[in-house]
Each structure stands twice: as structure tokens, then as C-alpha cells.
């Protein structure tokens, strides 16, 4: 199991944790439904970060490459206190430090899927709609310290 670190949030633009906190403070925030971030693997160069935004009824998961660029993002919404649903996944491709292509998948519980491919240079947006089986998009809400189900890259 990879080491886990906590902070108030992850600052994407600067690639740093804001207000690191110890486990007891993070646990208290979790129990109170207050936001906090989970850094997986390292406090300074994590491979993944999880934004526990229970006050907004959502969880964000960002996967970082070796250069700290967020190449994959998942967004889950709380359906109730016990279950999450994956509503959005975004995959980004980079050329040096700039995103050149982003593909976003927007899911709903009824099985509707919207796929948006955004080419950034030159700008072009493609969008298609489809259907999918939503069964695999449900996850149990994580207990404090148990984030393994959220860290699955291949969904």
C-alpha cells in the first residue's frame, strides 16, 4: 500500500499541497464532512490526489504523471452517505507543459453518455452521445483512510 498524506487542498497550478495536516486532523474533517485532500505516494510529488468535498457532495480524483501534470480526472457525486456515482472522467494529452487534447466522458445514472473531445491547437470541439451500462460507475463512499476503490485507473 502506498503512503497517504493529507492537506486542506491540492493547488493544481502550482502542483503543491496547501496546508498539510496530520491524520488526526484529516480524520476529524472527514467525520465532520469538511473538505480535505488525500495525497497518494508522496506529500510533495503524489501520483494521485483525492479531493474529499463532502460539503459539496462530491469527490474528485486526479492522477498525475511524472511531471506533475493531471492526465486523468474522475469526478464522483454522493448519492447518499454510503454510495458514489462516477459522473465525469477526463483524459488529457500533453505537448510539453500544455494540454493539446482533452476527452471528457459525462455519465448519468440512466445510462446516457456524452463524449467531448476538445482539440486545443487549433481549437476544435467534437461531441457525440451514446449509452452505457452504469453499473460499473457506482462505488461505496470511502471510509476514512480507505481510498483504494477511488484510485482505480482503468474503469
Task: Provide a role label for each language-model segment.
Residues 50-55, 62, 72-80, 103-106, ...:
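Beta-turn initiation residues at beta-strand->coil junctions
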Residues 44, 56-58, 68, 81-83, ...:
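Residue-level signal for glycine
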Residues 32-40, 58-64, 101-105:
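A structural detector for short beta-strand units
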Residues 1-33, 90-155:
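Long terminal segments
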Residues 24-52:
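N-terminal interaction modules that seed assembly of large macromolecular complexes
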Residues 43-48, 67-72, 97-101, 110-114:
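A short glycine-rich beta-turn/N-cap micro-motif
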Residues 41-43, 64-66, 91-93, 107:
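Generic beta-strand structural signal
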Residues 76-97:
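Long amphipathic alpha-helical scaffold regions
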Amino acid at each position: 500500500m502506498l503512503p497517504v498524506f493529507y492537506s486542506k487542498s491540492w493547488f493544481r497550478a502550482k502542483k503543491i499541497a496547501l496546508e498539510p495536516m496530520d491524520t488526526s486532523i484529516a480524520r476529524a474533517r472527514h467525520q465532520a464532512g469538511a473538505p480535505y485532500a488525500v495525497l497518494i505516494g508522496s506529500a510533495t510529488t503524489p501520483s494521485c490526489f483525492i479531493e474529499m468535498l463532502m460539503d459539496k457532495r462530491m469527490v474528485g480524483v486526479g492522477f498525475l504523471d511524472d511531471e506533475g501534470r493531471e492526465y486523468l480526472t474522475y469526478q464522483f457525486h454522493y448519492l447518499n452517505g454510503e454510495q458514489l456515482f462516477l459522473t465525469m472522467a477526463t483524459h488529457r494529452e500533453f505537448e510539453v507543459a500544455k494540454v493539446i487534447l482533452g476527452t471528457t466522458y459525462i455519465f448519468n445514472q440512466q445510462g446516457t453518455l456524452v463524449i467531448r473531445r476538445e482539440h486545443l491547437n487549433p481549437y476544435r470541439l467534437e461531441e457525440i452521445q451514446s449509452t452505457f451500462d452504469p453499473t460499473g460507475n457506482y462505488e461505496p463512499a470511502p471510509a476514512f483512510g480507505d481510498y483504494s476503490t477511488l484510485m482505480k485507473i482503468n474503469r
